[in-house]
Amino acid sequence: MADSVRVGLIQLTAEDTPAANVRKTLPRIEEAAAKGAKIIGLQEMFTTKYFCITQDPKNFDLAEPIETGPSVTELAKAAKRLGVVIVAPLFEARGSEVYHNTAAVIDADGTVLGK
């Protein structure tokens, strides 16, 4: 077992759409992995601009399911390809009218370990 683990933390300015934020984040994940990070943490609500100060229903469209959502799906591919664990906080749609500020934990084999 290794005596230490390198952790990479990524903080970026947010774009207007979740897809744009994922596209912006993926190269930084690759960069962190290339520098030896085995665990990579993203900023809170990485797929959106931070809006949690208010409860505005117009933001509910930005939520996505953890297990099947497009953002986690793309990150899972990257985690598997790079052999890294990714902690990805995002706005989760967890059912009808149930939303959470959640972090998905994606293992180095691309599986979602939990949230």
Where is each model-derived feature located?
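Cys-nucleophile CN-hydrolase/nitrilase-fold catalytic domain and related Cys-dependent amidase chemistry
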Residues: 18-19, 27-112
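Active-site-proximal beta-strand elements of phosphoester/diester hydrolases
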Residues: 4-16, 102, 114-115
